[in-house]
Amino acid sequence: DVYKRQASELMVALQCGGSDALSGVTANPALGYACDLLVAQGGTGVLAETPEIYGAEHLLIRRAIDDATGKRLIGLIDWWQDYTARNHGSMDNNPSPGNKKGGLTTILEKSLGAASKGGTTPLTGVFKYAEPVTARGFTFMDSPGYDPASVTGQIASGCNLVTFTTGRGSAFGSKPSPCIKIATNTEMYERLMSDMDINAGAMLTEGQSLEEKGREIYDMLLTVASGNPSKSEA
């Protein structure tokens, strides 16, 4: 039997790992465009990894639907700053060695790319780790920057699909929510084609537009939600 469901029932985790210099140029903005399309249909996007929006949090705070929502996000950043200071660390200890090999230079550069996964719509809610996401639209969930831990929280919060952009490459997959992998560059996509669902590098190598790639990602969300397996599931 076939059961029809609305796109508004989708809650999508917006995740990245193994970022490179093209993450903020191709895959992440394209995912942000797809998130906007999803939100327009009544669906929900859930951004996470609080330490990895450090330095770009103002771009999200000014999109908050009200002062209370913006202040909740500020509170999360303040907590992580205090936590790292108490443990003799700092919030600017990113990017990782792999990020640097991929061309990222500072946490600010990395954060600008990470934040772009959230598109352009208002920030409707800010939630604790694994707290049920009760708002519709673009939301944020507190989590560490470690991908498996972050995605686990997003799934526990209610995400029934996971989108995962990567530039350096990643073998990450998830259950019970399917994971759609998006490559930032064509070289890596061709090398890991058996594990990548979408090549956002085609925006550079084939001249595809942001809108075209964003629509492709959105269509893939619907395809996988309809039962077709992603590469991580195959």
Where are the regions a protein language model picked out?
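Short, small-residue-biased leader/transition segments that mark boundaries at the very start
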Residues: V2-Y3
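Anaerobic metallocofactor- and corrinoid-dependent redox/one-carbon enzyme cores
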Residues: E9, L14, D20-A234
